[in-house]
Amino acid sequence: MDVEGAHAAIRLPEGNRWDWDVIAWDGGQLRLAAGYDLAYHHDLELVFGDPFFVCCPGTFHDPVFRAPTAEELLRVTRQVGEEPAVVVAFEADAGGQEPVSCLIAAERFEVVRESVLRYWREDAGPDQRFAPWVRSPDQQVASGPAGPLPTTD
């Protein structure tokens, strides 16, 4: 990750990544995944540790990252009570007539470059991992596609 200051615009590694989505989000982590065809895989993740302010759609295209404005920093600081360690701002195509402004504040930030498959593949290489929802055929039979089967006890 290249950051030229606490709240500078992030610069991503080179590559064709126009499709983006939220791959995971819980209290401790927000993961944005990017690739050129999210139906099959992605090769980049932006990982926000302990996110406490998130304003972005679940899926979007062609984000343009920029430094947050003074107004955006003030907005986040007022809402959370202190200036956050990480603030990432970008404009993206969310399918509407105009780009949407997005803002994410967190304690930590990391860029992960790794091939992540979004479907089961028996011959996946050691340099690939599976998205959280991908299950092997054996796991699907044991638990069903949507989780464990109910018992009739």
Explain the meaning of each model-derived region.
Residues 1-153:
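Surface-exposed, interaction-prone regions used to assemble/regulate multi-protein complexes
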